[in-house]
Amino acid sequence: MKKFMILAASLLLFSVTSAYADNDRPIQFNQLPEAAQQFINTYFPDQKVSFAKEERDFMEVSYEVMFTNSIKIEFAGNGEWKEVKCKYSTLPEGIVPEQIVNYVNTNFQGVSIYAIDRGYRDVEVSLTNGLELTFDLNYNLIDMDD
């Protein structure tokens, strides 16, 4: 009987967490965290939001915003940006850390940055020449992929 109760409790817990996981819902712009709204208003003031959603995965909340021109931004639960991707243009000035911009301008003249992904341990940028550069949190180049 004890094993049955443990099994039943485990199944119930698994069911609840599975139902809670992957709980995405569309939201309005004003439902984004304040920091996310400020980021969008600062760097993309003339862009029209096509779609915004809140993503809930177990204990983590994140947000995704897509603009009508295919620019996509992902935000952490606190509103800090995690990823910015400009499919048909380059990133606005001020998003990419200056050290990375200087490295790209010095080593890849005439090439622009169209995407940036900020992780816990590194920052990855995608260049218009097809290269992806990965920097540590001190902005030292640690990897390059084509």
Locate the predicted segments by residue.
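Interaction-mediating elements
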Residues: D22-D146
